A protein has these predicted regions:
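Hydrophobic "anchor" residues on beta-strands that sit immediately upstream
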Residues: 2, 104
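PIN/NYN-family metal-dependent endoribonuclease catalytic core
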Residues: 4-5, 17-51
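Short N-terminal binding/cap micro-motifs at the start of the first secondary-structure element
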Residues: 12-14
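Acidic catalytic patch
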Residues: 40, 61-83
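Acidic, PIN/NYN-like endoribonuclease modules and their adjacent C-terminal/linker elements
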Residues: 83-86, 90, 97, 102-103, ...
Length: 140
């Protein structure tokens, strides 16, 4: 199962070692799932951490060893994704769909919340706790 991580999930996983977002990284390290993020998502997470929790940049760098880097989406795909989410979030949705992720995991309820539990072009959008559930269901 491939889970695409939004910048806010990367941020939260970096600053909260016991949270749900970090649990996804641990499960990926154990081979229970694959995680992916785009340069756009990683850059946003790095900027936010540098401003708000600079001491957590090392944690993000360590976690990225378990996250596949996928390409940013073509601008045309981002334009298409803008039909579903705000323009600033369209590159995230577009990259997740372009990577053929099973799930886009995001904590952004304001912009993605109305899509939680729904699929957009084959990629289901879920908050971290719900994104974790199918991974745990696969673990023996």
């Amino acid at each position: 199962m491939l889970l695409f991580l939004d910048a806010n999930v990367l941020f939260t996983a970096s600053i909260s070692p016991d949270g749900t977002s970090r649990a996804l990284v641990r499960l990926s390290a154990e081979g229970a799932c694959r995680l992916a993020a785009s340069p756009f998502a990683i850059d946003e997470a790095q900027r936010d951490i540098a401003v708000k929790r600079e001491g957590s940049l090392a944690a993000l760098d360590a976690m990225l060893a378990y996250v596949d880097l996928v390409a940013d989406a073509h601008p045309a795909l981002s334009t298409w994704a803008g039909r579903y989410v705000a323009a600033k979030d369209a590159p995230i949705l577009a990259a997740a769909v372009g990577a053929r992720a099973d799930v886009l995991v995001t904590g952004d309820r304001r912009h993605f919340g109305y899509l939680f539990g729904r699929a957009v072009h084959g990629t289901r959008i879920e908050p971290p706790r719900d994104g974790l559930r199918p991974v745990l269901d696969q673990v023996p």
